[in-house]
Amino acid sequence: MQAFRVHTGIGVPLRRSNVDTDQIIPAVFLKRVTRNGFEDGLFATWRVDPSFVLNLSPFDRGSVLVVGPDFGIGSSREHAVWALMDYGFRVVISSRFGDIFHGNAGKAGLLAAQVAQDDVEFLWKLIEQKPGLEITVNLQDRNINAATVVLPFKIDDYTAWRLLEGLDDIALNLRKLDEIEAFESARPAWKPRTLPTT
């Protein structure tokens, strides 16, 4: 996973709330056996509308999504995070996220930055007044820079640390490889094992 420190990208105003994971990527797009290639399914039901924000320039090149409250609610669907990232998003800004989506985002490298709803409304207005507005999100300082405005955002320390270090679940385990190997070497031979095939 790529470490996240600072990202600058075009802001995209998605004026919708209660966006569940099935709206982010409908189930019909979940048949792949790989972890990439899900961008075509992102907001597929809405993207058939030519006036949908991601069909409009310059928002079709955006990488900072600003959304209403309760984004990513519903079923656990890692594909929702993967679809956002495959499309090019690195940051999602909202006043409230679904808990499971929030966890999946941090594990995959997508920053879910939580701000006050007034700040979401303010960002929407800024972006709509100046389409193509670049927003800079600094994870180390936990702030969002848009035009001349600096807004703080919330993220738990553990998720911030993982993002800053670029640590997915596998990388976390590999950091403990010496301890894992020491444990395995001391494990009694009569206990069951899962060994690689040769």
Swiss-Prot record:
Q: Provide the transmembrane region boundaries.
A: none
Q: Which UniProt keywords apply?
A: Amino-acid biosynthesis, Branched-chain amino acid biosynthesis, Leucine biosynthesis, Lyase
Q: Does the keyword rRNA processing apply?
A: no
| Coiled coil regions, renumbered to chain | none
Q: What GO cellular component entries does it have?
A: 3-isopropylmalate dehydratase complex
Q: Which InterPro entries match?
A: 3-IsopropMal_deHydase_ssu, Aconitase/3IPM_dehydase_swvl, AconitaseA/IPMdHydase_ssu_swvl, IPMI_Swivel, LeuD
Which Gene Ontology BP terms does the record give? L-leucine biosynthetic process
Q: In which pathway does it act?
A: Amino-acid biosynthesis; L-leucine biosynthesis; L-leucine from 3-methyl-2-oxobutanoate: step 2/4
Q: What domain of life is recorded for the organism? A: Bacteria
Reaction(s) this enzyme catalyzes, per UniProt: (2R,3S)-3-isopropylmalate = (2S)-2-isopropylmalate
Q: Which E.C. number(s) belong to this protein?
A: 4.2.1.33
Q: Has UniProt tagged this entry with the keyword Lyase?
A: yes
Instruction: State the Gene3D superfamilies in the record.
Output: Aconitase, domain 4 (3.20.19.10)
Gene Ontology MF terms in the entry:
3-isopropylmalate dehydratase activity
Quaternary structure and partners: Heterodimer of LeuC and LeuD.
Tell me, in a sentence or two, what this protein's role is: Catalyzes the isomerization between 2-isopropylmalate and 3-isopropylmalate, via the formation of 2-isopropylmaleate.
Q: Which family does the entry's similarity section mention?
A: Belongs to the LeuD family. LeuD type 1 subfamily.
Name of protein: 3-isopropylmalate dehydratase small subunit
The organism encoding this protein is Mycobacterium leprae (strain TN)
